[in-house]
C-alpha cells in the first residue's frame, strides 16, 4: 500500500509540473515550450516571451497552484469538521460570506476612497481582511448551528439559507454601487485566476502557505475528529481547540484566496472525494498532502480548459470546475454507500 501511495504521489507531482508548463504555454498567443522553459530558468533571450510569461502567465499559473491547494484543503477540513461528505466552503455559504465582505469593502471604497487608500490597502490587505471576516462570520454561524442541530441535512439547509441571505445583501449593495464598481464586482464573482498580480501573490502566498502548513500538522487530530466526538475524547483530543483551529485555518485560507480569485465552486467538495477514491484510505496523514497536490493539479487542468489556444476568449473557471466537480461528487456518493455511512 505504501508503494502504491508513493507512486500516486509521484504521478500527481509530475502531472503538476506538466500542467504548470502547459498553463504558461497556452493562451491567446501560444508560446514555444523551449522559450517558456528558458524564461523560467532565467536563460530567456526572447523579450516578448519573457514579458508575457513573467507578467501574465506565471502569476496566473502560480495562483492556480496555490488556490487549488488551499480551496481543496479547506473542503477536506470542512468535511472532517462537520463529518459531512457534502460540506464545502461554497455549499455552506462560506464563499458567500467572503463575497459579502468584499462587496461591503468595495462599496465603502466607492463612498470613502480617501479613507481606505490612506495606507495603500485599497486592493491588498483591505480586501483580504474583508473576505476573511466575512468567511469567518459565516463559518462561526454554521459551527454554532451544527452544535445544536445534529442532523446533517438541517446543517446543510442552514448553510444554503445563509448563502441566500448573503446573496441578498450583495444584491442590495450592488443596487447602490456605481456602474464601474458593479462591473468590477460581477467579473470578480465569476471566479478567475488570471487577474492576480505579483503584489497580490506576495500577500496571498505566505497566508495560504501558513494555512497549509498548519493543516499538515493536524492529521492525527483530524483522524480522531472524523471518527466521532466520543472517540476523539477517549484518545485525549481537545475537541474545542481542534474545531477552533480548523475554523480559523479554513476562514483564513478561504478568505485570502476568494479575495483575489473570486468564489471557485465544487473544487473543495470534489477533490477530497477524488483523493479518497484514488488512494483508498481515510487516513488524514495521506489525505492532507494528497489533497493539497491533487487540488493544485486539478485547478491547473481546469485553468487549461478555460482557454482555447489562439483565441482571445476565456471561459469562467467556475464553469469548468462545476462540470468536472459535480459528476465526481455524484458518482462517489451514489457508488459508495460505505462513504455515506461513515459520516452518519
Model-derived features with residue positions:
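Alpha-helical transmembrane segments in inner-membrane proteins
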Residues: 1-344
Amino acid at each position: 500500500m505504501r508503494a502504491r501511495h508513493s507512486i500516486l504521489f509521484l504521478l500527481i507531482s509530475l502531472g503538476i509540473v506538466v500542467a504548470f508548463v502547459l498553463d504558461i504555454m497556452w493562451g491567446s498567443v501560444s508560446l514555444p515550450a523551449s522559450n517558456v522553459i528558458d524564461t523560467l530558468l532565467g536563460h530567456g533571450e526572447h523579450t516578448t516571451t519573457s514579458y508575457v510569461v513573467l507578467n501574465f502567465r506565471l502569476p496566473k499559473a502560480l495562483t492556480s497552484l496555490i488556490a487549488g491547494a488551499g480551496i481543496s484543503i479547506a473542503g477536506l477540513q470542512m468535511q472532517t469538521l462537520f463529518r459531512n461528505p457534502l460540506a464545502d466552503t461554497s455549499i455552506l455559504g462560506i464563499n458567500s460570506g467572503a463575497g459579502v465582505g468584499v462587496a461591503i469593502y468595495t462599496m465603502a471604497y466607492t463612498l470613502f476612497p480617501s479613507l481606505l487608500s490612506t495606507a495603500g490597502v485599497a486592493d491588498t490587505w483591505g480586501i483580504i481582511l474583508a473576505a476573511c471576516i466575512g468567511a469567518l462570520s459565516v463559518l462561526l454561524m454554521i459551527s454554532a448551528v451544527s452544535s445544536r442541530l445534529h442532523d446533517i441535512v438541517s446543517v446543510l439547509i442552514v448553510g444554503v439559507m445563509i448563502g441566500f441571505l448573503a446573496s441578498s445583501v450583495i444584491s442590495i449593495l450592488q443596487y447602490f454601487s456605481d456602474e464601474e464598481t458593479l462591473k468590477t464586482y460581477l467579473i470578480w464573482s465569476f471566479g478567475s485566476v488570471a487577474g492576480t498580480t505579483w503584489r497580490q501573490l506576495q500577500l496571498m502566498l505566505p497566508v495560504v502557505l501558513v494555512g497549509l502548513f498548519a493543516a499538515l500538522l493536524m492529521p492525527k487530530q483530524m483522524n480522531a475528529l472524523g471518527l466521532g466526538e466520543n472517540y476523539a475524547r477517549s484518545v485525549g483530543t481537545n475537541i474545542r481547540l481542534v474545531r477552533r483551529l480548523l475554523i480559523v485555518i479554513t476562514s483564513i485560507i478561504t478568505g485570502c484566496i476568494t479575495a483575489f480569485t473570486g468564489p471557485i465552486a465544487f473544487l473543495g467538495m470534489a477533490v477530497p472525494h477524488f483523493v479518497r477514491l484514488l488512494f483508498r484510505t481515510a487516513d488524514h496523514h495521506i489525505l492532507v498532502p494528497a489533497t493539497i497536490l491533487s487540488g493544485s493539479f486539478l485547478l491547473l487542468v481546469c485553468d487549461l480548459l478555460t482557454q482555447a489556444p489562439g483565441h482571445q476568449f476565456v471561459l469562467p473557471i467556475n464553469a469548468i470546475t462545476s462540470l468536472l466537480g459535480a459528476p465526481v461528487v455524484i458518482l462517489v456518493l451514489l457508488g459508495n454507500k460505505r462513504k455515506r455511512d461513515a459520516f452518519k
